[in-house]
Amino acid sequence: ASVGFKAGVKDYRLTYYTPEYQTKDTDILAAFRVTPQPGVPPEEAGAAVAAESSTGTWTTVWTDGLTSLDRYKGRCYDIEPVPGEETQFIAYVAYPLDLFEEGSVTNLFTSIVGNVFGFKALRALRLEDLRIPPAYSKTFQGPPHGIQVERDKLNKYGRPLLGCTIKPKLGLSAKNYGRAVYECLRGGLDFTKDDENVNSQPFMRWRDRFVFCAEAIYKAQAETGEIKGHYLNATAGTCEEMMKRAVFARELGVPIIMHDYLTGGFTANTSLAHYCRDNGLLLHIHRAMHAVIDRQRIHGMHFRVLAKALRMSGGDHIHAGTVVGKLEGERDVTLGFVDLLRDDFIEKDRSRGIYFTQDWVSMPGVLPVASGGIHVWHMPALTEIFGDDSVLQFGGGTLGHPWGNAPGAVANRVALEACVQARNEGRDLAREGNEVIREASKWSPELAAACEVWKEIKFEFEAIDVL
């Protein structure tokens, strides 16, 4: 027994590398992509990650004797190589449930990714996936409403929802901003959206924007007979100010508000999600800052982890890449985390980047939002890839229409309805998509004009983050 108490630095793997460990149903499991410094063996690096993100410290401390390390320590229970990468491997770590505060994504992340990413023995570290056990996920409210309740609130079924980010994102007055909102909704969109960086700036204060957008919503609803919404961005510099904006939105009677969950922070986001459920507001989530965290292949955190965290913290929509537009996202990997957002039970599937089987035990789902550099020619592919339970957002693809905003909205709605109808008739959108759009444009001059403008535009770059 005295071996453990010799002074100085000890090997982590003595305590924290336990290949014989059988994971428990209540454990939180993590898959880390580890790139150790030269000369550091994989077992030591994996054990170091487990230790530093749970109970360990760099030396023996007397107070270890006052607790049961076996009960509380993280354990590296498996290590596997990464095909084609000699210097990397995947370390699997199991964390006992009791290490984490209930209902706190903030605490979960502070423990698992808080300190260990600056660790000297590692050249780089990336959290690829987390398995959240029902015992932990059940301590969260989750999304304020979820997919089915949202469809019932909006009375929209059997098709993706259509949105549009109002551009130019900064510089419009509240009155002109509201006018653009009205034109898009009147033309046939379900939603318009504040850009993520529209908060409350000198050229347009939040209260003025909220009032003019509410007016636009009610006018468009009265004229179309459809329920309309505008994502009013409640993100603010303090939590109190954020809640004040949410309360004002509720007083206006609008259906949906918005939050930037990474820049705003998980604590603020979870508070807002609770308010939204209690007051019948839908919550649209933007992922501004995600690429700072998730873009590098060898370091940071994969977006699927940020997506799972959002489902626990709470949001009804979240931006999830497009597969086809200007922001990157590899198809299988994107569909992997789209399923993690929407579905109740997701099987482990390494080809889609899903390292663990995830059971959400009836936590409401989140609608993925495809947004960024997409236009009418992408509609068949988007309908095919994302299916009905999604929001397709065309900013420039609506407001860039040569005839104006409302015709831009008409073009998108006609294209969407044509794609959904073609799919329901059994046509193959992947193969016949362009033909479907061309046929529809014969009956819609607005769509024909849009087809002409965007016929050649593509954003073609190799994806950085491939499996």
Swiss-Prot record:
Q: What is its main location?
A: plastid
Q: Which InterPro entries match?
A: RuBisCO (IPR033966), RuBisCo_large_chain_AS (IPR020878), RuBisCO_lsu_C (IPR000685), RuBisCO_lsu_C_sf (IPR036376), RuBisCO_lsu_fd_N (IPR017443), RuBisCO_lsu_N_sf (IPR036422), RuBisCO_lsuI (IPR020888)
Free-text cofactor note? Binds 1 Mg(2+) ion per subunit.
- Cofactor requirements of the protein: Mg(2+)
The cellular location(s) given in this protein's UniProt record come to:
Plastid, Chloroplast
Q: Name one GO cellular component term.
A: chloroplast
- Where is the PTM N6,N6,N6-trimethyllysine found along the chain? 6
Point out the annotated site residues (description: Transition state stabilizer): 326
Look up the EC number in the record and give it: 4.1.1.39
One Pfam family for this entry, by name? RuBisCO_large_N
Fill in the PTM field for this protein: The disulfide bond which can form in the large chain dimeric partners within the hexadecamer appears to be associated with oxidative stress and protein turnover.
Q: Which GO terms describe its molecular function?
A: magnesium ion binding; monooxygenase activity; ribulose-bisphosphate carboxylase activity
PTM-bearing positions, type N6-carboxylysine? 193
Sites binding substrate sit at: 115, 165, 169, 287, 319, 371
Name the Gene Ontology biological process terms.
Answer: photorespiration; reductive pentose-phosphate cycle
Question: Which reaction is this enzyme known to catalyze?
Answer: 2 (2R)-3-phosphoglycerate + 2 H(+) = D-ribulose 1,5-bisphosphate + CO2 + H2O; D-ribulose 1,5-bisphosphate + O2 = 2-phosphoglycolate + (2R)-3-phosphoglycerate + 2 H(+)
**Residues binding Mg(2+):** 193, 195-196
What keywords appear on the UniProt entry?
Answer: Calvin cycle, Carbon dioxide fixation, Chloroplast, Disulfide bond, Lyase, Magnesium, Metal-binding, Methylation, Monooxygenase, Oxidoreductase, Photorespiration, Photosynthesis, Plastid
Q: Does the keyword Magnesium apply?
A: yes
Q: How does it assemble?
A: Heterohexadecamer of 8 large chains and 8 small chains; disulfide-linked. The disulfide link is formed within the large subunit homodimers.
Family statement: Belongs to the RuBisCO large chain family. Type I subfamily.
Free-text function comment from the UniProt entry: RuBisCO catalyzes two reactions: the carboxylation of D-ribulose 1,5-bisphosphate, the primary event in carbon dioxide fixation, as well as the oxidative fragmentation of the pentose substrate in the photorespiration process. Both reactions occur simultaneously and in competition at the same active site.
Leftover remarks:
The basic functional RuBisCO is composed of a large chain homodimer in a 'head-to-tail' conformation. In form I RuBisCO this homodimer is arranged in a barrel-like tetramer with the small subunits forming a tetrameric 'cap' on each end of the 'barrel'.
- State the name under which the record lists this protein: Ribulose bisphosphate carboxylase large chain
Q: What does UniProt list as this organism's lineage?
A: Eukaryota, Viridiplantae, Streptophyta, Embryophyta, Tracheophyta
